[in-house]
Each structure stands twice: as C-alpha cells, then as structure tokens.
C-alpha cells in the first residue's frame, strides 16, 4: 500500500470505516435524536447525525452503550423520520464508536429507495 493510500485510510472517520462494509451506503447528513432503553430499563438518548444510509440501514456515531441487536429509535426534528431500528454492527476506533442499524420495517419517506 502506498503512503498516500495509508494516509487516506488513517484520515477516515470511524463511521466512514464502518460504511466500507456497506457497499450500497450513500453519504447523507440527517440530524436525529437517538434513544434506546438501557438494560436497567432507563431511557438513554442523544443527538447525533446519520452520516450514511442504504435503503435498509443507517450509520451514525454514538456515545451511548449500544451493542449488537439493541433496539434504537431515530427521530428527526420535524418527525418526518420516526423509526425503530436494530443495531447490526458496531465499530470502535480511536476512542469513538460507529453504529449501523437496520430499519425494523418499511420506511415510507426514507430518502434512499431500494
């Protein structure tokens, strides 16, 4: 691998690296409120940005303690996106975490169509 290629790979964000595992992923930028229930049944939430999407998945950074098969809710500011999804991948890199979650059902108004 050339030095330039290695530098480009090092410069990719954690979410960009996870997106490489989803060849159909397109870059998007959608601000959402992410929420989930902790194992103790406490509601956890944060604001995040969906950075990549496919017709069935979204990829975003998160500081919440999410794991494979956790259920999350994603809601944008005008509630035109209000969906449940299941975590299908988590990637840790340089102290950051990227998450991929698959929609639990058909999302009528999702911007990326199959």
Each model region followed by its residue ranges:
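Structured alpha-helical
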Residues: 1-114
């Amino acid at each position: 691998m050339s030095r330039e290629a290695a530098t480009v790979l090092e410069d990719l964000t954690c979410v960009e690296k996870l997106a490489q595992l989803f060849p159909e992923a397109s870059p998007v930028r959608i601000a959402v409120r992410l929420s989930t229930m902790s194992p103790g049944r406490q509601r956890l939430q944060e604001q995040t940005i969906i950075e990549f999407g496919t017709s069935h998945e979204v990829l975003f950074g998160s500081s919440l303690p999410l794991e494979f098969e956790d259920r999350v809710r994603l809601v944008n500011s005008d509630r035109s996106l209000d969906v449940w999804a299941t975590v299908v991948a988590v990637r840790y890199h340089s102290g950051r975490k990227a998450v991929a979650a698959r929609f639990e059902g058909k999302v009528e108004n999702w911007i990326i169509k199959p």
